[in-house]
């Protein structure tokens, strides 16, 4: 364990002392302890906040608040303990946004230094979601078992404050973070943001993402440490994860949790092949190990969450799947391995014989049932998949309705272009096409037959030919190549976020 301590100690020169305590001085402590702040109401101009979240603007806002306390106290304040009033959402939002911008600075600098040290190419393709699936195809085809993991969230806000304390030795920032979490933060909204009206989940996405990423970053640092110490091959992409304060103490806690058998049990995991992929709160751990060893990893993860993060995680949140029998639901695709038998005729001297060669492939398909469920939620069809009209768009122009439906089809086709089977995608396009027709018919108070007869049968053919038309523009001199790519699998490296209908969190697709 001594060599681990030497390896994991944080260099004093890399500790970052934040600049904003010098700017805010005693105002941060006033925010955290002076309840007279709760009675201040400052009229703020309306507008966006992205261009107003600098440290200077936040300092001015806090200064005005601090001075306003001593000038006016409203006796009719019905809730003196509530910092955020009905008209102060922009006020608190601005402070939290400025806090998020400032605390992100040292971590972004650390990432840039790590990329420069590793001499990695800063390509935008690395940010594409679709780049994960070629990685699956190249590395998962020879593996056997997969751990499908849902990362649990901490229930108590103080856990995030403690996690943040491992990174930054700055009391004022901890006071401010604790104030945000305890005074006006609805913690249930962080756990289930899609069902919440909390301003942090809906109007402060930067602050929400910072807290969430800090939690996941802490979890993955310990996980990669265990993985690297249990493997013959060391990971080359987890270098910055080891820059931790008191990391040696964490390892000692893990040793106590695992009944002082840390070194005795790690030999069970020694295998050079293990891959880890995560997007948001879902991760995939693939290995060539047998089910017994995968159960060991499941045991270690559950105990890590329970004893270090104080999060009770049911074992059902971690599923052990066979790569060639079960599907992996990840990023809106159902993925699994498949064995294809290829018969080859060979001849040796005068005797001819057949050889059956089994070729391993990794296929990805479109999950039709979840997509229809998303279309049902968005009011494009009913629960049986029958298209219905979109009454909320009835007041819009015909060109707007058609353009809106075509953008949805284009986005779905673009996102699911890597599917091995396109028939499910054709059904989704059919639902949207008929829903578009019914929406126009509802607007004009006509019938489907009369409407299509008036516009022609080729009116909605673009719903099926849009993606092929795009590929024909990319390959203008090879029409056969563009059609083959349209029917085949294409991974686009310009997709940096998951599709809204696939993500099941939003009801509308935002036009590009």
UniProtKB/Swiss-Prot annotation:
The keyword Plastid applies. The keyword RNA-binding applies. Pfam families: Intron_maturas2, MatK_N. InterPro entries: Domain_X, Maturase_MatK, Maturase_MatK_N. GO terms for molecular function: RNA binding. It is found in: Plastid, Chloroplast. Transmembrane segments: none annotated. Keywords: Chloroplast, mRNA processing, Plastid, RNA-binding, tRNA processing. Coiled coil: none annotated. Disulfide bonds: none annotated. GO terms for cellular component: chloroplast. One of its GO terms (biological process) is tRNA processing. Its main location: plastid. Belongs to the intron maturase 2 family. MatK subfamily. Usually encoded in the trnK tRNA gene intron. Probably assists in splicing its own and other chloroplast group II introns. This is Maturase K.
